[in-house]
């Protein structure tokens, strides 16, 4: 017997898809399978749990049982999918199997942990489950090393500093947020972190970790070392593609899908952090919301392509928040930076003086929506 639409995953992407399907069809069979508890929480909250004094269980917004009852679902929590037989249209776990009409992969992404000696001592904060496993160590830690100065690393550095901890942030790049914007734009946040007491080790490399009687010894390049109580890897995410690969689907950085969120198999779709949409991996909330709306229509028989507008990315650093949009990482842009006491507006323009990207901060973030309208689609 078919289980109708089967979704592997229970995170933000899966839940958005369920809600959009149920707005249009209250009765089509929906089955969700995931390795976690399937309780709902807001993942961006993980960047602020330490300063807010929150435990992992405090993040739960809705239990799996409440979710199943509200949306008429068959849920299989704490269940590891081991294989997908795409030809037979069957999903398999160790003790069960599910026939599907359509299958959606919403398997997310896992935190990348640098392959250095002692890497098992590094913690990750990519899920409620991961935070639950290390919350006592993080709460008790006085000295924290954050590896990676990107979006998540910068958010965590500020949060741990606000909680009164001694924070060191290390990154290979010459500036923070290097994959998102040039140093002349990120320098305002970088300066604020330094003012708060974050010790920035830029153009630096972690070479290994070793447990000691009094903490963890981190060995760095140039014959340097520091001792800390906890080390957090914030070095990016890697789309979870193992199941898709075993099913014979086309994989690049993520699970390759077209504008209809369809994989190389006509009955299998991918959504969220695991998906690579026409060559782009977009692990942000707004593209996932828009993708879920389109995919719900397509699963119910419509033929709707995904069209993504210019979208804001929010960096949640409360002492100096930032919004950005457009091709901020383009190397050929000229940046026009206007800095005032109440904030910054940085405009990235091309050779024809066309706005291609912008970054705004603090009280000037209200200018973002006007700038967004002038970006090319």
Curated annotation (Swiss-Prot):
Gene3D superfamilies hit by this protein: 3.30.390.120, FAD/NAD(P)-binding domain (3.50.50.60)
Disulfide cross-links: none
Pfam families in UniProt: Pyr_redox_2, Rbx_binding
Catalytic function, reaction form: 2 reduced [nitric oxide reductase rubredoxin domain] + NAD(+) + H(+) = 2 oxidized [nitric oxide reductase rubredoxin domain] + NADH
EC id: 1.18.1.-
UniProt pathway annotation: Nitrogen metabolism; nitric oxide reduction
A GO molecular function held by the record: oxidoreductase activity, acting on iron-sulfur proteins as donors, NAD or NADP as acceptor
Enzyme type, top EC level: oxidoreductase
Key words of the record: Cytoplasm, FAD, Flavoprotein, NAD, Oxidoreductase
Function: One of at least two accessory proteins for anaerobic nitric oxide (NO) reductase. Reduces the rubredoxin moiety of NO reductase.
Family (UniProt): Belongs to the FAD-dependent oxidoreductase family.
Protein name in the entry: Nitric oxide reductase FlRd-NAD(+) reductase
Source organism of this protein record: Escherichia coli O9:H4 (strain HS)
């Amino acid at each position: 017997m078919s289980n109708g639409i089967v979704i592997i995953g229970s995170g933000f992407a899966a839940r958005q898809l369920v809600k959009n399907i149920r707005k249009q069809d209250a009765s089509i069979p929906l089955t969700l399978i995931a390795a976690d508890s399937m309780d709902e929480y807001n993942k961006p909250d993980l960047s602020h749990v330490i300063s807010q004094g929150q435990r992992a269980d405090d993040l739960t917004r809705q239990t799996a049982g409440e979710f199943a009852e509200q949306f008429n679902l068959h849920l299989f929590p704490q269940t590891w999918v081991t294989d997908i037989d795409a030809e037979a249209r069957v999903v398999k776990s160790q003790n069960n199997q599910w026939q599907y009409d359509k299958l959606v992969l919403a398997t997310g992404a896992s935190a990348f942990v640098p392959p250095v000696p002692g890497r098992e001592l590094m913690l990750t904060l990519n899920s409620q489950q991961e935070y639950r496993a290390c919350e006592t160590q993080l709460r008790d830690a006085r000295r924290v090393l954050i590896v990676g100065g990107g979006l998540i690393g910068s958010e965590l550095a500020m949060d741990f500093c606000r909680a009164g901890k001694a924070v060191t942030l290390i990154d290979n790049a010459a500036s923070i947020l290097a994959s998102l914007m040039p140093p002349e734009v990120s320098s305002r946040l970088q300066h604020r972190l330094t003012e708060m007491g974050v010790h920035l080790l830029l153009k630096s490399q972690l070479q290994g970790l070793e447990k000691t009687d009094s903490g963890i010894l981190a060995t760095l390049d140039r014959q340097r070392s520091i001792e800390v109580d906890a080390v957090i890897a914030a070095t990016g995410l890697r789309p979870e593609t193992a199941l898709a690969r075993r099913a014979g689907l086309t994989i690049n950085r993520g699970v390759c899908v077209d504008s209809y969120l369809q994989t190389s198999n006509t009955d299998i779709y991918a959504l969220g952090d695991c998906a690579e949409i026409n060559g782009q991996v977009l692990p942000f909330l707004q593209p996932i919301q828009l993708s879920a709306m389109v995919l719900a229509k397509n699963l119910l028989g419509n033929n709707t392509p995904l069209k993504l507008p210019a979208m804001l990315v929010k960096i949640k650093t409360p002492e100096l928040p930032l919004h950005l949009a457009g091709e901020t990482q383009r190397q050929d842009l000229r940046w026009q930076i206007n800095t005032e006491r109440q904030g910054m507006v940085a405009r990235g323009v091309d050779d024809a003086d066309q706005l291609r990207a912008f970054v705004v901060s603090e009280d000037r973030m209200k200018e973002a929506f006007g700038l967004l309208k002038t970006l090319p689609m």
